[in-house]
């Protein structure tokens, strides 16, 4: 039996890999405008695997780490994380936070974490992670 997540994983990876600039324009037009596309971009799949391989944070679907340059000349890394699911997942905001922090901690580069939630719920749209001690 085929895992439903696997069915969605490969096409999303191919779309991002082959059409990254168009993908960013469609899903993240404001971010797209800030990128200097004339300088190109570089997928950092090996760097991402170094950071997340030991994470015990639940399922990972399509994750891409891409080095781009802002129009200001600043190098930034963009973490694109795509969740394909039909229900809420409580660990998603935490996982995004952990990936962002681990990338920054290991490589000392600013990271923009972007998510495409491809589930059918219009009410579940996590936009932050936090916790309180007191």
List each language-model region with its residue ranges.
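Accessory alpha/beta interaction modules
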Residues: 1-134
């Amino acid at each position: 039996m085929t895992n439903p997540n696997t069915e969605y994983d490969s096409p999303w990876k191919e779309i991002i890999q082959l059409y990254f600039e168009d993908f960013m324009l469609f899903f993240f037009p404001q971010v797209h405008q800030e990128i200097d596309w004339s300088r190109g971009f570089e997928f950092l799949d090996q760097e991402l695997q170094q950071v997340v391989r030991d994470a015990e944070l639940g399922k990972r679907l399509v994750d891409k780490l891409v080095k781009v340059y802002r129009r200001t000349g600043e190098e930034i890394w963009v973490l694109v994380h795509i969740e394909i699911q039909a229900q809420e997942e409580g660990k998603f905001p935490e996982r995004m936070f952990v990936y962002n922090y681990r990338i920054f901690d290991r490589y000392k580069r600013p990271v923009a974490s972007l998510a495409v939630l491809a589930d059918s719920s219009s009410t579940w749209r996590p936009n932050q992670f936090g916790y309180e001690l007191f």
